[in-house]
């Protein structure tokens, strides 16, 4: 099955408004492809909990999530 990539809408504007800080904890309740989570994690030494009810979305993220050294917790549940 081929999955089309989703481009987050207004990514920079949303993350700028959030203004992530070091040691902050954030929730991405519509994780999907993880675009917002990656952007948040790249801006600060923080933790993100990514929720998605689709197990495929969570499974696809497991490999790249390791690059964040445990700062991304993937949760396969609806928010």
Please state what every model-predicted region is:
Residues 47-52:
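Conserved SAM-binding motif I beta-strand of class I
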Residues 65:
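Conserved hydrophobic residues forming the short capping helix/wall of the S-adenosyl-L-methionine
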């Amino acid at each position: 099955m081929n999955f089309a990539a989703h481009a987050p809408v207004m990514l920079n504007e949303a993350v700028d408004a959030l203004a992530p800080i070091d040691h902050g904890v954030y929730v991405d309740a519509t994780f999907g492809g993880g675009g917002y989570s990656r952007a948040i994690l790249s801006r600060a030494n923080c933790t993100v909990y990514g929720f998605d009810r689709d197990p495929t979305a969570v499974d696809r993220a497991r490999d790249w999530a390791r690059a964040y050294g445990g700062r991304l917790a993937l949760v396969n549940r609806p928010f």
